[in-house]
């Protein structure tokens, strides 16, 4: 990517709308727009000023009445000269406006190129740039809030403080090396141990937030499982508030997984209605059962339905008890369904598992019927929500890996200190940890990493 040229792209979504914005950034941005703008001379305009005029094409034909907003470098989003042309929405006017800018000397922007230029010009670090993509992709209120926290720099500040601590450690050790022939002590062993222990604890705490960040970003997967005709599809429809799955009295109606989403307490929950679990000679249904089993193993929460009038068989009890006993991450909830047909029958209780009964059929008309399930889901994410509100959380797998590697390096430094290894070897580990943290914020990076990160973005961002 060259920063010597000027780029342009439509920055707003396609489709019918009151307004659209065509953005241009680069050394010639103001001159290029001025060539096709009939109104105030934009080349004479002050920064952060808006100008009403008419945009024309290469032949001088009017395209649209527009507002051109000028931002002069370095006081712009990208750190370069930027002009944002606001035209009428729809498909045609923005396309014609963009084409005019391209005809007058701009180049079509690559995906994420505006944000990449902001990063390269020091307007944001790499973690903040990635937060822009996360903010755009956010599918729930809490994911949006967590991404905004990163964009505002709280996460980067935390990493910056950690790097400062490691630099302090490195400085102390290197001073000891430089003055090893003299009777000068810059930091005693206990002080170095304390600093390493503190750094290790902070890194460990940060890594512990990743499951929270992952759930906020990707959502919580709730699998609805059980025997055929237990009422799984009816429950799915009740949980999401509309008919998403076909409901039939015929066992085996659901042969493939059906997914639906709902936001509860600001968190995205992904509900998966699975094929009924049973032995079958039907190849298509058998494939559905296989997929259902896989989904249960990957679930965050399992709502296991059974018909109260039929009860749980020994195979189901063993399956659920195994999930409870083997320390699985899956949290099963045993649900006795069709309580409207058997109001006096108790729900099955299994050691270590939550059990309740309801009527999924009645729940479609009465939201209170599924409220205990919604409360349970809220409880499962309560700790995550509390953690996200208290401090920034790690939401990015790339960051997680760099933090793991930084933690490994700090732990190796601690072991080296305990073993009495020379200061030279100790600083190698500390410098390795510094590099890993620098890779998160972009202080240390390479072109391939940048290409991979910014390719996630849409054109115009």
From Swiss-Prot:
At the top level, the lineage of the source is: Bacteria
For this protein, the record's CDD domains field holds: trmE (cd04164), TrmE_N (cd14858)
Q: What is its EC number?
A: 3.6.-.-
The main location is cytoplasm
Print the keywords alphabetically: Cytoplasm, GTP-binding, Hydrolase, Magnesium, Metal-binding, Nucleotide-binding, Potassium, tRNA processing
What PROSITE patterns does the entry give? G_TRME
Major enzyme class: hydrolase
* UniProt: GTP binding residues: 229-234, 248-254, 273-276, 337-340
Kindly give the SUPFAM superfamilies that the UniProt entry links to this protein.
P-loop containing nucleoside triphosphate hydrolases, TrmE connector domain
Offer one example of a GO biological process linked to this entry: tRNA wobble uridine modification
The UniProt entry, under Pfam families, shows: MMR_HSR1, MnmE_helical, TrmE_N
Using the record's annotation, list all stretches that form the TrmE-type G domain: 219-382
- For the ligand ((6S)-5-formyl-5,6,7,8-tetrahydrofolate), the binding residues are 23, 84, 123, 461
Record field: transmembrane: none
InterPro entries associated with the record = G_TrmE, GTP-bd, GTP-bd_TrmE_N, GTPase_MnmE, MnmE_dom2, MnmE_helical, P-loop_NTPase, Small_GTP-bd
Q: Which cofactor does it need?
A: K(+)
Record note on quaternary structure: Homodimer. Heterotetramer of two MnmE and two MnmG subunits.
Q: What does it do?
A: Exhibits a very high intrinsic GTPase hydrolysis rate. Involved in the addition of a carboxymethylaminomethyl (cmnm) group at the wobble position (U34) of certain tRNAs, forming tRNA-cmnm(5)s(2)U34.
| Family label | Belongs to the TRAFAC class TrmE-Era-EngA-EngB-Septin-like GTPase superfamily. TrmE GTPase family.
Q: Which HAMAP family does the entry mention? A: GTPase_MnmE
Spell out the protein name for this chain.
tRNA modification GTPase MnmE
């Amino acid at each position: 990517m060259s920063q010597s040229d000027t780029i342009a792209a439509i920055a707003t979504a396609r489709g019918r709308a009151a307004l659209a914005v065509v953005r241009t950034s680069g050394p010639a941005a103001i001159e290029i727009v001025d060539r096709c703008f009939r109104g105030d001379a934009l080349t004479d305009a002050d920064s952060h000023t808006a100008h009403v005029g008419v945009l024309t094409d290469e032949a001088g034909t009017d395209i649209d009445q527009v507002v051109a907003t000028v931002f002069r470098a370095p006081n712009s989003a990208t750190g370069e000269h930027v002009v944002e042309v606001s035209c009428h929405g729809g498909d045609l006017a923005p396309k014609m406006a963009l084409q005019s800018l391209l005809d007058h000397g701009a180049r079509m922007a690559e995906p994420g190129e505006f944000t990449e230029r902001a990063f390269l010009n020091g307007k944001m670090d790499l973690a903040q740039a990635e937060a822009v993509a996360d903010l755009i992709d956010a599918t729930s209120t809490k994911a949006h809030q967590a991404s905004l926290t990163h964009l505002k720099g709280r996460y980067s500040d935390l990493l910056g403080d950690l790097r400062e601590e490691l630099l302090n450690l490195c400085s102390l050790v290197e001073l000891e090396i430089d003055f090893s022939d003299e009777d000068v002590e810059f930091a005693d062993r206990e002080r170095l141990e304390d600093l390493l222990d503190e750094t290790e604890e902070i890194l460990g705490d940060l890594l512990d937030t990743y499951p929270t960040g992952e759930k906020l970003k990707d959502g919580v997967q709730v699998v609805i499982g059980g025997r055929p005709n237990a009422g799984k599809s009816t429950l799915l429809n009740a949980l999401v508030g509309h008919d998403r799955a076909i409901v039939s009295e015929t066992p085996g109606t659901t042969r493939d997984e059906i997914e639906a989403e709902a936001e509860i307490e600001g968190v995205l929950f992904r509900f998966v209605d699975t094929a009924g679990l049973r032995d079958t000679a039907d190849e298509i249904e058998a494939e559905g059962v296989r997929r259902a089993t896989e989904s249960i193993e990957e679930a965050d929460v399992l709502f296991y339905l059974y018909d109260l009038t039929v009860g749980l068989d020994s195979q189901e009890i063993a399956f659920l008890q195994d999930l409870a006993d083997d320390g699985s991450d899956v949290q099963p909830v045993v649900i006795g369904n069709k309580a409207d047909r058997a109001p006096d029958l108790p729900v099955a209780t299994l050691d270590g598992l939550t059990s309740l009964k309801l009527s999924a059929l009645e729940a479609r008309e009465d939201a209170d019927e599924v409220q205990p399930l919604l409360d349970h889901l809220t409880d499962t994410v309560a700790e995550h929500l509390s953690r996200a509100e208290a401090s920034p959380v790690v939401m990015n797998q790339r960051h997680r890996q760099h933090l793991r590697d930084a933690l490994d390096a700090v732990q190796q430094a601690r072991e080296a200190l305990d073993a009495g290894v020379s200061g030279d070897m100790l600083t190698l580990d500390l410098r390795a940890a510094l590099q890993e943290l620098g890779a998160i914020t972009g202080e240390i990076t390479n072109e391939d990493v940048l290409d991979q990160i910014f390719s996630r973005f849409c054109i115009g961002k």
